[in-house]
Amino acid sequence: MGIHGLAKLIADVAPSAIRENDIKSYFGRKVAIDASMSIYQFLIAVRQGGDVLQNEEGETTSLMGMFYRTIRMENGIKPVYVFDGKPPQLKSGELAKRSERRAEAEKQLQQAQEAGMEEEVEKFTKRLVKVTKQHNDECKHLLSLMGIPYLDAPSEAEASCAALAKAGKVYAAATEDMDCLTFGSPVLMRHLTASEAKKLPIQEFHLSRVLQELGLNQEQFVDLCILLGSDYCESIRGIGAKRAVDLIQKHKSIEEIVRRLDPSKYPVPENWLHKEAQQLFLEPEVVDPESVELKWSEPNEEELVKFMCGEKQFSEERIRSGVKRLSKSRQGSTQGRLDDFFKVTGSLSSAKRKEPEPKGPAKKKAKTGGAGKFRRGK
């Protein structure tokens, strides 16, 4: 879910924080991508007029989505995929709710199938989609053959994407989860891995502008996000987005808001874990950006054909064609961006951003199969 209603709220009260760009605008940019979110998008992709996300046996697969969306970034984008680690304990309540919703969707799917309601069948089938360890492992193997770096986050992928962006290792974090801003990513990109059929422009959300327009610091913004509703604790019933903004701007903290609220009108949840949620957002368990070395290498064409065609039964012609496009883009992206060498003034994206040094668990290193070093494609 991320943060409930945050994208709409920013569009309403801080529209200058949002930019829309064509993918060609990102030539030479390094971007940290939430891998699990991308895989989920590939698994629920609607295949209109073609079966590009299915193999010759008709099996839906995330591999072709990962292959083609990564190649789609042939305008010189340098992606690094970040995979989820162990979910934080605070998320257990949200995960339990998702299991309940999945069980209910299974019942509704069966009823829709018996009634022959095709649209309802598709809707409830999507609700049952879940990214598995096998999906992750196969996509990691594919990325290594493509020469694309990836890493395993110790916990939430979007938090580690944000850490990489804060440290300047990448230009932005790419995910659909708005809590990437709550974790402190200076720039959040949405729709980067969305289906081409949707024709969605890439949206950029700039945290510094959000804070400036709202008149908040990062700690107050975190409190606002908790009031809106997150994956990690309940929100206060009866407080909508506009009211939440007004309250945090006036009282500056959740603690002061709670002290002044009428409990009969706005009852605070019992055993409310807002302090734990604050700490999780401000000091998340993330990769240590300084230990991460990002390298992109040439794709291994023959091993890709062996894996994608021999094992997974995809068209060899499509795979070899894709490899050629990937190699061509790799050569182009090595030229670099002009603003990597010259400071560009008056540009939102080129503004220097000073972020606080990560503390405590934020310094934890990436989990990379026990090797202790960042794994990269060969």
Swiss-Prot record:
Residues binding DNA: R47, R69, E156, G229, D231
Basic residues bias: start-end ranges: 361-378
Modified residues (Phosphothreonine): T334
GO cellular component: mitochondrion; nucleolus; nucleoplasm; nucleus; protein-containing complex
Interaction with PCNA, as annotated region: 334-342
Enzyme class: hydrolase
Keyword Magnesium: yes
Primary subcellular site in the record, as a coarse category: nucleus
Binding site for Mg(2+) 2: D177, D179, D231
Free-text remark on how the cofactor is bound: Binds 2 magnesium ions per subunit. They probably participate in the reaction catalyzed by the enzyme. May bind an additional third magnesium ion after substrate binding.
PTM-bearing positions, type Symmetric dimethylarginine: R19, R98, R102, R190
Modified-residue entries (Phosphoserine), positions: S185, S195, S253, S291, S333
Residue ranges, annotated region (I-domain): 120-251
GO annotation (BP), single: DNA replication
Record text on subunit structure and interactions: Interacts with PCNA. Three molecules of FEN1 bind to one PCNA trimer with each molecule binding to one PCNA monomer. PCNA stimulates the nuclease activity without altering cleavage specificity. The C-terminal domain binds EP300; can bind simultaneously to both PCNA and EP300. Interacts with DDX11; this interaction is direct and increases flap endonuclease activity of FEN1. Interacts with WDR4; regulating its endonuclease activity. Interacts with POLB.
Family, per entry: Belongs to the XPG/RAD2 endonuclease family. FEN1 subfamily.
HAMAP family reported in the protein's UniProt record: Fen
The protein's name: Flap endonuclease 1
